[in-house]
Amino acid sequence: MFANRWLYSTNHKDIGTLYLLFGAWAGMVGTAFSILIRAELGQPGSLLGDDQIYNVIVTAHAFVMIFFMVMPIMIGGFGNWLIPLMIGAPDMAFPRMNNMSFWLLPPSFLLLLASSMVEAGAGTGWTVYPPLAGNLAHAGASVDLTIFSLHLAGVSSILSAINFITTIINMKPPAMSQYHMPLFVWSILITAVLLLLSLPVLAAGITMLLTDRNLNTTFFDPAGGGDPILYQHLFWFFGHPEVYILILPGFGMVSHIVTYYSGKKEPFGYMGMVWAMMSIGFLGFIVWAHHMFTVGMDVDTRAYFTSATMIIAIPTGVKVFSWLATLHGGNIKWSPAMMWALGFIFLFTIGGLTGIVLANSSLDIVLHDTYYVVAHFHYVLSMGAVFAIMGGFIHWFPLFSGYTLNYTWAKIQFLVMFIGVNLTFFPQHFLGLSGMPRRYSDYPDAYTAWNTASSMGSFISLVAVILMVFMIWEAFASKREVSVMELTTTNVEWLNGCPPPHHTFEEPAYVKSNS
């Protein structure tokens, strides 16, 4: 029965599909918010209203894209679908908890949307810093609803993380060691550990904010001996690992795509890739204060956070050059998924370079809260995480659905999206360098030209999103079935056919060890 299958599902493939659909829908909402932002900024002067409504839209855009698009698709969608198949497990370790992890997200989304419907909305930015998020600057229920939304999304992610860690460690065949796992499995394992360690700190921080707002505590209020800087430390101790949570599964997917379409049986430097991801995961926890260079830290503290942040470039560089080495000498197949992966490598590297610039505390003091920062993190998210999702989706779509996409349309869509995102975010570097601040709905006329270019780019990206929807419709309408898959011996998720049966591995998978 339909309701039983989809509401009470304990099947990793069905839950993965639910995550993908939910993430796609949230992605539409988040895209709509971003179009509103760029429409407002396309010309000087006011379009939608004051800065409060503008910042409510910015905040909603961030939360929707992070917690309801990237994480559900990468970890929930691809993770649920692929991890059990890749390690030969019959399902996830805790199938019913898996179901709950998903069904906590729609109520969480509902609370977030409710927060913008009551009072003036939560116009705090996704960081929700007090005192702006306190009960004077944001009277009413908006910020409280946002906090509850974050709590639900956080519980969902923590349960999901426990589930993935248990599944990956405990449900491999006896012959498969840690170092025989595909890189995507590694990336999800490391991501899950990061979630498990960072989310409780966020929960503590926003719970203290909640009591400051409603129960008259003064954790973040200097009048009662509190300190708003404490909130920033708690938030960014979560917030920085979070950005690595958003990109690590993308690293895993790109490794698979680049290896597959280079005709290689394994990625270059497997162990280097694994250790690079583990290093990134570890270092991600000890650099959080580089988001706070402007709050007045000691010079030696700033020196530490500058150098620690720069060290992350080393394992990241290991990954980039290993991808290039995987490509080297390969029989390269220019499929759309490969194009997304190559676009990922190039644009993520550019985003990484601007990150190195911002790691310098002296430079960051000038660039902090300008559009240079916006350009930086959108290069690594809008062209890193999103490109990885697009490449992964196109690569594994035949596995999920049993049908193939039209490759010509897929290549056109890639080209449109590539032009759109670059036209949107490249000019923002110039705006930032000339001092245009973030989180304002209006700006001096001097900034008009680059803002107009940026807004044009966002509308091109919108066309690409619509093209994507059309491509998926076209694939299901045409029903071109998958004829044959290549390289299945080193891509075990394809071994059970396209799509795989509802229950795979009803008896334990036999894995022969080559080492």
Curated annotation (Swiss-Prot):
Disulfide bonds: none
Compartment list: Mitochondrion inner membrane
Positions with a binding annotation for Fe(II)-heme a: H61, H378
Residues that bind heme a3: H376
Binding-site positions, Cu cation: H240, H290, H291
Catalytic reaction list: 4 Fe(II)-[cytochrome c] + O2 + 8 H(+)(in) = 4 Fe(III)-[cytochrome c] + 2 H2O + 4 H(+)(out)
Residues in compartment: Mitochondrial matrix: 1-11, 87-94, 171-182, 262-269, 328-335, 401-406, 479-515
GO molecular function, one term: cytochrome-c oxidase activity
One cellular-component annotation, GO: respiratory chain complex IV
Positions that bind Na(+): E40, G45, S441
Annotated metabolic or biological route of this protein: Energy metabolism; oxidative phosphorylation
Coiled coil: none
Positions on the Mitochondrial intermembrane side per record topology: 41-50, 118-140, 213-227, 287-298, 358-370, 434-446
Residue stretches spanning the membrane: 12-40, 51-86, 95-117, 141-170, 183-212, 228-261, 270-286, 299-327, 336-357, 371-400, 407-433, 447-478
PROSITE patterns according to UniProt: COX1 (PS50855), COX1_CUB (PS00077)
Chain residues that bind Mg(2+): H368, D369
EC number: 7.1.1.9
CDD domains per the UniProt record, alphabetical: Cyt_c_Oxidase_I
Protein family according to the UniProt entry: Belongs to the heme-copper respiratory oxidase family.
Protein name: Cytochrome c oxidase subunit 1
Organism: Loxodonta africana (African elephant)
Gene expressing this chain: MT-CO1
